[in-house]
Regions:
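Hydrophobic anchor at the beta1->P-loop junction of P-loop NTPases
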Residues: 3-5
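ATP-binding Walker
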Residues: 11
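ATP-dependent small-molecule kinase phosphotransfer cores
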Residues: 33-104
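Walker A/P-loop
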Residues: 14
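Small-molecule kinase domains that catalyze NTP-dependent phosphoryl transfer to phosphate-bearing small molecules
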Residues: 120-121, 142-209
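P-loop (Walker A) phosphate-binding loop of NTP-binding proteins
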Residues: 8
């Protein structure tokens, strides 16, 4: 069984995954972490990106410069689609290998699993972690040491998660992309309180899923 954990920036996805790992012993695959590692592990991936984007992403000694790629993505939305078209096949193969190494229940953590066509019908159960936008922004600023404007830009890039946070996701027509994506969610965990409260919510959600 693949349990997907998703949510917007600062929602507490990683906290939920740690609770699941500690309580149930399920291995966790962090898509965001693995993608960052791909840039080091697979030089051919960087070769493909540099060719597709027609720019250098490594310095003179061959070290990947994430800030360069981030700047390209931030300044041009089309760059993100190009990057995803190159990276997602690596992610798919890597996760398939992870599942083979870990028979049984596994957790797939990703912020974008509901918003990308690549992940359509992905996973057996989906947990969405949510919190008020202001709380998510404050958490992300403290965690990353980033300024508020930069964090807000990342929040704005997750429209579905914002629609969930402000409650407007239920206002969309049933045939809209937002409504279809949200319909995949099996459990919503609101992470706006203490760690004890969060742990109780996670245990309740998992116990229901595993019946």
């Amino acid at each position: 069984m693949v349990i997907v954990v998703t949510g917007g920036i600062g929602s507490g996805k990683s906290q939920v995954c740690r609770i699941i790992a500690d309580r149930y012993g399920f291995p966790v695959y962090s898509a965001d972490l693995r993608v960052r590692q791909f840039y080091v592990e697979f030089p051919e991936l960087l070769d493909a990106l540099e060719t597709s984007l027609n720019c250098a992403l490594r310095n003179d000694v061959g070290t990947f410069q994430p800030s360069v790629l981030a700047g390209k993505i931030f300044s041009d939305n089309s760059v993100l689609k190009t990057v995803e078209s190159v990276v997602f096949p690596y992610l798919s193969a890597d996760f398939a290998a992870f599942v083979q190494r870990n028979p049984g229940h596994v957790v797939f953590e990703s912020a974008t699993v509901l918003e990308k066509d690549f992940f359509a019908d992905f996973g057996d159960a989906v947990i969405l972690v949510d919190a008020p936008v202001e709380l998510r922004v404050d958490r992300a600023c403290r965690r990353d040491g980033a300024d508020r404007q930069r964090v807000m830009a990342r929040v704005d890039a997750q429209p579905l998660m914002n629609a969930v946070s402000n409650g407007s996701v239920n206002d969309y027509p049933e045939d809209s992309s937002f409504a279809k994506a949200f319909a995949r969610v099996d459990k919503v965990i609101i992470n706006d309180g203490t760690m004890d409260k969060l742990e109780e919510a996670v245990i309740s959600a998992l116990d229901d899923m595993l019946i």
